């Protein structure tokens, strides 16, 4: 991977925008981060080159030089890859958003940095399926969760009797120096993850993990109007730290589809089957709504797929409670079979409108003539 073009490393096109670049970097940094891939040398190397590529391409000056002269041009200017420069804050923001805590309500994770000696993130996320009506009206649900708690026998270190020894990879510093061309930068040690120490002998109780898993039942109040992809923070129900404090639980909702209603944001769509005679003559019919039913007035000659909009009959907005629209769309129903009496009545109706019985010959005369002319030459 180290021989690849920087754009190929980040899996983006050469004309990608800054936002596209940042999104691609976030995805790959999360995928190859040492915390997610302990003792994986290949992931560690990929993580380094992903950071190197982003440091170059996210800097306008470096990117211009790289586009013209390649990596050699950067080294000739003393502008190799690696951490440093204006984008370090950008990178830390991304890491904090991926691995931090804090935050509140709906949205992403916060920016609390993790203690290097902590074997796991305190915040974690699970998916919570909801029935269609539970999401629309809100509900209270009891869910069982599994969270991590420090191993009492080793004090959460993962080492037998809590005995640790100096990390031989970073010499106990918790960081290692990396070099890219003339530049060098410090990176969290991938072996000890910044702690500066390593396990001498695994704890027999937790097998070196530093934690055990516990289960608990949590009552969740789901607000009305949530939709698939919305996230809810539940403070104090994440993993437990060594000091006894707990992180936060994040719930990502997945809303099941309904048999009749189709949701689009806060709007609700429903298909209304209408017999063709009802559409022609006009009629007032009852249709279901989220709260019950209402009357839909079909005017004479209502068209197939015609829509009728009812304001305030949709889903309440999860933030302000304002309801969306109910949109009823007509689906014309035609009879599959007719008897002789019905056929006779329909033919009389057709004649009363002056409709020609044989494929509208007069209507298509000019078209027939045009087609004949195609074959004359």
UniProtKB/Swiss-Prot annotation:
Q: Which InterPro entries match?
A: DnaJ (IPR012724), DnaJ_C (IPR002939), DnaJ_domain (IPR001623), DnaJ_domain_CS (IPR018253), HSP40/DnaJ_pept-bd (IPR008971), HSP_DnaJ_Cys-rich_dom (IPR001305), HSP_DnaJ_Cys-rich_dom_sf (IPR036410), J_dom_sf (IPR036869)
Q: Name one Pfam family in it.
A: DnaJ
Q: Does the keyword Chaperone apply?
A: yes
Binding sites annotated in the UniProt record for Zn(2+) 2:
167, 170, 189, 192
State the needed cofactors, names only: Zn(2+)
Main subcellular localisation: cytoplasm
One GO molecular function term of this record is: heat shock protein binding
Q: Where in the cell is it found?
A: Cytoplasm
Q: Which Gene3D superfamilies match?
A: DnaJ domain (1.10.287.110), Heat shock protein DnaJ, cysteine-rich domain (2.10.230.10), Urease metallochaperone UreE, N-terminal domain (2.60.260.20)
For the keyword Nuclease, the answer is no
Detail which positions bind Zn(2+) 1: 151, 154, 203, 206
UniProt repeat feature CXXCXGXG motif, residue ranges: 151-158, 167-174, 189-196, 203-210
Q: Which residue windows are transmembrane per the record? A: none
Q: One GO term of the cellular component aspect?
A: cytoplasm
The record's remark on the cofactor is:
Binds 2 Zn(2+) ions per monomer.
Q: Which domain of life is it from?
A: Bacteria
A single GO BP term for this record reads: response to heat
Q: Which UniProt keywords apply?
A: Chaperone, Cytoplasm, DNA replication, Metal-binding, Repeat, Stress response, Zinc, Zinc-finger
What positions does the domain J occupy?
Answer: 5-70
| UniProt function note | Participates actively in the response to hyperosmotic and heat shock by preventing the aggregation of stress-denatured proteins and by disaggregating proteins, also in an autonomous, DnaK-independent fashion. Unfolded proteins bind initially to DnaJ; upon interaction with the DnaJ-bound protein, DnaK hydrolyzes its bound ATP, resulting in the formation of a stable complex. GrpE releases ADP from DnaK; ATP binding to DnaK triggers the release of the substrate protein, thus completing the reaction cycle.
Q: Which NCBIfam families match?
A: DnaJ_bact, PRK10767.1
Q: How is this protein organized at the quaternary level?
A: Homodimer.
Q: Which HAMAP family match?
A: DnaJ (MF_01152)
The similarity annotation says: Belongs to the DnaJ family.
Q: What is this protein called?
A: Chaperone protein DnaJ
Read off the lineage from the record. Bacteria, Pseudomonadati, Campylobacterota, Epsilonproteobacteria, Campylobacterales
